[in-house]
């Protein structure tokens, strides 16, 4: 089925920054997709095109990307008469038309917006749910509902506190269904709010970009202690484990790490990667930490490799791998991590996202699908995670509608699958393992 019309506009994301939305029309109707954007971005990500006009949205407008769709990409696709079910052909055509390594001509935000809309239209054309269409594109006969990783305490670049590490997450792996995982997550979240309020006062329960709390604490183990207390208070010590996103590239200074990077710089307090690794091992020993993302800088390969060889938990590459097949291949070869964080806007098309996921999975890695801190009401990644069978998703706390949009969509998908629904649970690292 051919595309009839492609129209892009500038909308606002959950942080009040402009982003790209695309409407694609076929005989089956209108299909709409919106593109997310990140706060802590890896230097190897595909280029998000911003206008740079300081007099408008502080330089963050996306009118150029919108114009690239309306004037160039859209007309070229309509002229080419490609079918919306041919996701790979459509994406390949756009990437070749752009012609740059990092999509800097049109912007990854322009190409991805069209790619997402095409995927939704393709599902409608086939008369199947989006998650089923994505599973077909990936060659997956099965569907798996993921364990949600709720980011409930925020630090790093996501929060105005002194906490260096960016995210502290709870994963209800002991739940029997996605719906139960949501309930457990929400209950722990409310208990955590009570614990923080009692210890730090009411204003400590304001929420960050992703719906988590950002109490003004400095010590990272204090955040873990708060989680442990809340999990106990909610009554789920046997069902909930902890994940972290350190985003260490944000506090990497001249080969060392600064765990107090929001204070005036003092090289005397910087620590080595090895020392930081010892701190993580301490966390793993004292708390139910099962996953650590970006524990070291995106170019500190040697430290990643030596750390991975000494632990048996999940080590996730985000800034390290940026959903990019070349970086993933490098990380596989160096044995730097064992899980890929999959962000569609880091690579900039549906086809390349699926390829990155399959590359990681074929090397025995886990894959965690992820939102960005600047999100929209778009729910594409909920269907993506089910179709790709990755078994884990992080899309914020159970708070703020742009986060709940994804979680609620996952509950609907589970409901639609009925007794065929499979929840990853404790097998979240490798849900396809029999």
Swiss-Prot record:
It catalyses: (2R)-2-phosphoglycerate = phosphoenolpyruvate + H2O. Keywords: Acetylation, Cytoplasm, Glycolysis, Lyase, Magnesium, Metal-binding, Phosphoprotein. Mg(2+) binds at residues 245, 293, 318. Its main location: cytoplasm. Substrate binds at residues 158, 167, 293, 318, 370-373, 394. Brain (at protein level). The alpha/alpha homodimer is expressed in embryo and in most adult tissues. The alpha/beta heterodimer and the beta/beta homodimer are found in striated muscle, and the alpha/gamma heterodimer and the gamma/gamma homodimer in neurons. In striated muscle, the fiber-type order of ENO3 expression is IIB > IIX > IIA > I. The modification Phosphothreonine is found at residues 72, 205, 229. One of its GO terms (cellular component) is plasma membrane. Its cofactor is Mg(2+). The modification Phosphoserine is found at residues 83, 157, 176, 263. Pathway: Carbohydrate degradation; glycolysis; pyruvate from D-glyceraldehyde 3-phosphate: step 4/5. Its EC number is 4.2.1.11. Belongs to the enolase family. This is Beta-enolase. It comes from Mus musculus (Mouse). The lineage of its organism: Eukaryota, Metazoa, Chordata, Craniata, Vertebrata.
């Amino acid at each position: 089925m051919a595309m009839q019309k492609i129209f892009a506009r500038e909308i606002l994301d959950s942080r009040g920054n402009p982003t790209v939305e695309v409407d694609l029309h076929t005989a089956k109707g209108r299909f709409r997709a919106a593109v997310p954007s990140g706060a802590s971005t890896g230097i190897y990500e595909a280029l998000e095109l911003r206008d740079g006009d300081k007099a408008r949205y502080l330089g963050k407008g996306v009118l150029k990307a919108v114009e690239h769709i309306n004037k160039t990409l859209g007309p070229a696709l309509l002229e080419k008469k490609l079918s919306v079910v041919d996701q790979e052909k459509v994406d390949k055509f756009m990437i070749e038309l752009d012609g740059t390594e990092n999509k800097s001509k049109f912007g990854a935000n322009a190409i991805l917006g069209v790619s997402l809309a095409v995927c939704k239209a393709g599902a409608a054309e086939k008369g199947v749910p989006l998650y089923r269409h994505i599973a077909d594109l990936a060659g997956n006969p099965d569907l798996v509902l993921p364990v949600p990783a709720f980011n409930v305490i925020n630090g790093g670049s996501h929060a105005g506190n002194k906490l260096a590490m960016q995210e502290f997450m709870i994963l209800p792996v002991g739940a029997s269904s996605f719906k139960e995982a949501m309930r457990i997550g929400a209950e722990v979240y409310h208990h955590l709010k009570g614990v923080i309020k009692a210890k730090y006062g009411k204003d400590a329960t304001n929420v960050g970009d992703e719906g988590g709390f950002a109490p003004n604490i400095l010590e990272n183990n204090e955040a873990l202690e708060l989680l442990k207390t809340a999990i106990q208070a909610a009554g789920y010590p046997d069902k909930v484990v902890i994940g972290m996103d350190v985003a260490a590239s944000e506090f990497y200074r001249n080969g060392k790490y600064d765990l107090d990077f929001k204070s005036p710089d003092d090289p005397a307090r910087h620590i080595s990667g090895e020392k930081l690794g010892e701190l993580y091992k301490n966390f793993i020993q004292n708390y139910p930490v099962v996953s650590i993302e970006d524990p070291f800088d995106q170019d500190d390969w040697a430290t990643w490799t030596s750390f991975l060889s000494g632990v048996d938990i999940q080590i996730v590459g985000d800034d390290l791998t940026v959903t990019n097949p070349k970086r993933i291949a490098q990380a596989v070869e160096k044995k730097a991590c064992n899980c890929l964080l999959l962000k569609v806007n880091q690579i900039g098309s549906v086809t390349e996202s699926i390829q990155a996921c399959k590359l990681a999975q074929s090397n025995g890695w886990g894959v965690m699908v992820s939102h960005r801190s600047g999100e929209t009401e778009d729910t594409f990644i909920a269907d993506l995670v089910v179709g790709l069978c990755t078994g884990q998703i992080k899309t914020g706390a159970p708070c703020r509608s742009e986060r709940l949009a994804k979680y609620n969509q996952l509950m609907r998908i589970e409901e639609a699958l009925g007794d065929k629904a499979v929840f990853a649970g404790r097998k979240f690292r490798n849900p396809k393992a029999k």
